Design a protein with these regions (language model features):
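Zinc-dependent metallopeptidase catalytic helix centered on the HExxH motif
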Residues: 183-281
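Sec-exported extracytoplasmic/periplasmic mature domains
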Residues: 131-139, 220-229, 247-255, 321-326, ...
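Tryptophan-rich substrate-binding surfaces of secreted polymer-degrading and adhesive proteins
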Residues: 24-68
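Non-catalytic architectural context of zinc metalloproteases
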Residues: 67-208, 212-213, 351-358, 364-369
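Second-shell loop/turn segments in exported
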Residues: 109-121, 200-210, 228-233, 300-307, ...
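C-terminal segment of classical bacterial N-terminal signal peptides
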Residues: 15-23
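Active-site-proximal alpha-helical
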Residues: 270-355, 366
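Sec-dependent N-terminal signal peptides
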Residues: 4-13
């Protein structure tokens, strides 16, 4: 047989033996396909041949997920990158959290009759993350939480007498006052009742936005008090600031620390400050910034002053955790036991004093001021 004819017939035979696969342009949802179970990629979707009635057709397809490798943005005390710092701080905390075993104890729970169990379950998820994170340093023999909503006032007053909760209240106030203070009721308080670490939380608010950080925030206060001692009440921004930072990091988890979630939360904290503090920060004057930072001790009192610490102290903590890691922050807390001076504490733990830190911190904080 002629060699050219043999080659032609061989090619024809091969082409007839192969199954016909339609071009990508013919692959679309609802179009006819030939064999059930086969797949075809068209554009950014993978289509599967399925049975629809008596016909074999392509399904709606599944979009291919695009995984973007995280970019490691270099940061330093002289380069507090606005994206790099939140990401690095978050990574440092979550790395520790993921390597921590589940704590071996559960809180004792007292729940008001009007509280919905599903709402409690939401809170416990964030609280358990805080328990696990701080367990190597703070592991009380007993820890109790009290969850209430409007309508549980009488029950809470009785429970207060039973558990000794009145020591956690501001002078002259009752738990009924606390429940009725805000609408909806979402406030919380942490402290020690009859030598037992305790926090009380009102759950009338939905588990959304900043309310997700409340449980981890309050539990961080218990860690601070136990591991750092009472000196924390006399130093600026640490108590509420670090509780704020670990509250939002553990409460919002898992989340993108450069997303609108963090931005919205910081906006709310900034807006809740007194106008004098807002004016100091907006002035972008370094001396006014330093003076304001030094006014943020818990003993100054008042919700507006607490909001200053929530905001600027949270950012200060974020920077320290990003640059020097989680373990160094724990060391910083331990040093508070014997050192009541912020400048000396920073020098002892991080190697620089208060003024130096504030000078480096200020531009990072100013950049977070809402437009």
């Amino acid at each position: 047989m002629n060699k050219r004819l043999i080659a032609l017939l061989s090619t024809l035979s091969l082409s007839l033996s192969l199954p016909f696969t339609p071009a990508h342009s013919a692959t679309k949802a609802g179009a006819k396909c030939t064999k059930l179970g086969i797949t075809s990629v068209a554009g950014n979707k993978t289509f599967t041949c399925i049975k629809s009635g008596k016909k074999s057709v392509w399904n709606k397809g599944v979009s291919k997920s695009t995984v973007t490798a995280p970019v490691d943005i270099p940061i330093s005390i002289d380069n507090l990158d606005l994206k790099g710092v939140p990401q690095k701080a978050y990574d440092n905390v979550i790395k520790v959290l993921k390597s921590s075993p589940r704590a071996s104890y559960e809180p004792t729970k007292f729940i008001g009759a009007n509280v919905v169990q599903a709402r409690v379950d939401q809170e416990l998820a964030g609280l358990e993350r805080a328990i696990d994170l701080w367990a190597p340093y703070f592991k009380p023999d007993k820890f109790q939480v009290i969850y209430v909503v409007r309508g549980d006032e009488e029950w809470l007053e009785k429970k207060s007498t039973e558990l000794g909760l009145s020591s956690m209240l501001p002078p002259g106030e009752t738990w009924t006052d606390q429940i009725k203070k805000y609408t909806p009721c979402g406030n919380a308080a942490a402290g020690v009742a009859n030598q037992i670490p305790t926090f009380v939380q009102c759950l009338n608010v939905s588990y959304l936005g900043g309310y997700r950080q409340t449980g981890p925030h309050e539990y961080t206060h218990l860690f601070q008090r136990d591991y750092g001692g009472f000196n924390m009440y006399g130093i600026p921004w640490y108590a509420e600031g670090s509780a704020s930072y670990f509250g939002w990091t553990l409460g919002f988890y898992p989340y993108d620390p450069n997303s609108f979630v963090r931005t919205n939360w910081l906006y709310g904290l900034f807006s809740g400050m007194g106008m004098d503090a807002i004016s100091d920060f907006k002035s972008k004057d370094i001396q006014r910034f330093k003076n304001r930072m030094k006014l943020t001790t818990p003993r100054e009192g008042g919700q507006e002053k607490a909001n200053v610490s929530y905001w600027v102290g949270g950012l200060a903590t974020e920077v320290l955790v990003a640059l020097y890691g989680f373990d160094k922050f724990v060391e910083f807390t331990k040093n508070i036991q014997t050192n009541p001076d912020m400048s000396s504490l920073l020098k002892q733990t991080y190697g620089f004093d208060e003024d130096y830190f504030y000078e480096k911190l200020a531009p990072y904080v100013w950049a977070q001021i809402p437009a």
